[in-house]
Amino acid sequence: MAALCGGMLRGCILKPLGLSGSLQLKRNVRALRRTPVRVIQADEEGRERKQVEASRQRQPRQNESQACKAVGVSPATVDIEAPAHEFRYERALPGDKRLSKVVTIAKSKKFRDRHGQVLLEGQRLLTDALDSGAVLQTLFFSRVDYLKEFPPDKLRKTNLIKVNFENIKIWSDLVTPQGLMGIFAKPDHVKMTYPDTQTKHTLPLSLICDNIRDPGNLGTILRCAAGAGCSKVLLTKGCVDAWEPKVLRAGMGAHFRLPIITSLDWDIVPNYLPAGTKVFLADNFRPDNQNKPAEVSEKASDYGWVATDPKRIFITEDGYESSSDEEDNTDKLYIPGLEVQSYFERWAQGPCAVVIGGETHGLSIESLLLAEKSNGKRLNIPVVPGIDSLNSAMAASILLFEGKRQIENTMKRKSCVTE
């Protein structure tokens, strides 16, 4: 009986204790479900503030559609960022085809003529263009650090688009792309400003390019003209476009150091030459061939930047030459006979112009007539027998720097006389 009462007593005592334990357990579970307080460090707080400010600055640019319309492409969804150096640029998202479209159409001469835009690549070429006053409309770059190399005021109104370097590498014509490609408004020689060092050493020496159709040759010729101190370069119709990418690369910035006037008719060429300018033609005529009869050739290159007979000759309608003493001279065009002299003899004593013809089509009849009208001559560059002629770019460099030497010597003699 005592055992039975003791068991009942223990059950009554343990029951409230078990209930109390159950309540305590529930309280502990509820306490564990509470979210702990987050401790924010000072650096994390600053980082979050910057993220909030950056998110507020993400908004579409107002001139994006206008910029895309100018280059003939549709606008894409991009992010706008404001770097520390205050340049606002767009980050092109994956699938953005603006670069490929712009580069493709900018390499077309029809596009350049229609829209008046040219494509320049590389930091040096872009810098020279900006210094000369050319207007940069759109700049594609792969690294933000590249923007620091340009004057900030030159990029204020420019559409800056950051793209992956791989995209530039695909569309670049350079072996080692620099990650910079710019779309410029086609420069106008009247509105451009040239370096003071270039204008200070400018000579009364002009260059006329006649049927230069190789881009590499034309670019090299322009570079020689800038180095020799020519006052201007005139390109007649038939020459390759001076703003073709290959010409720009070979020119090494010569386009922005002296006036280059393109697509000229021969009728207006004299309007761009100073009064009293004598016109001289590059010629590979050899004195020992003077008494030899002219040979008829079907190759246009044989009538290249040179003539074969110093006497007056005619050209028939079928393109063949004939001497002036032949019986039938009907339906033939007159080609003037010009005196020939060696290039190292004195010829550059005043304002003068040198005409360089292309290696394929050579000098035009209009260039010969202009030289005759100005009392000019043909300049011969002696070469070893067996060598037909020199490259047009090589001939231009020889004649231009010889003209530079003669003009400078003449100026020195005149200065000594006046003193």
Swiss-Prot record:
Molecular function in Gene Ontology: RNA binding; rRNA (uridine-2'-O-)-methyltransferase activity
Biased composition (Basic and acidic residues): 44-56
Cellular component annotations (GO), alphabetically ordered: mitochondrion
Catalytic activity: a uridine in rRNA + S-adenosyl-L-methionine = a 2'-O-methyluridine in rRNA + S-adenosyl-L-homocysteine + H(+)
Record keywords, A-Z: Methyltransferase, Mitochondrion, rRNA processing, S-adenosyl-L-methionine, Transferase, Transit peptide
EC number: 2.1.1.-
Chain spans, region Disordered: 42-68
Signal peptide bounds: none
Binding, S-adenosyl-L-methionine: 357, 381, 390
Compartmental location: Mitochondrion
Record InterPro entries: Alpha/beta_knot_MTases (IPR029028), MRM3-like_sub_bind (IPR053888), Ribosomal_eL30-like_sf (IPR029064), rRNA_Methyltransferase (IPR051259), SpoU_MeTrfase (IPR001537), SpoU_subst-bd (IPR013123), tRNA_m1G_MTases_N (IPR029026)
Top EC group: transferase
FT transit peptide: 1-39
Family from the record: Belongs to the class IV-like SAM-binding methyltransferase superfamily. RNA methyltransferase TrmH family.
PANTHER family (alphabetical): RRNA METHYLTRANSFERASE 3, RRNA METHYLTRANSFERASE 3, MITOCHONDRIAL
Chain's role: S-adenosyl-L-methionine-dependent 2'-O-ribose methyltransferase that catalyzes the formation of 2'-O-methylguanosine at position 1370 (Gm1370) in the mitochondrial large subunit ribosomal RNA (mtLSU rRNA), a conserved modification in the peptidyl transferase domain of the mtLSU rRNA. Also required for formation of 2'-O-methyluridine at position 1369 (Um1369) mediated by MRM2.
Listed name of the protein: rRNA methyltransferase 3, mitochondrial
Organism: Xenopus laevis (African clawed frog)
Gene expressing this chain: mrm3
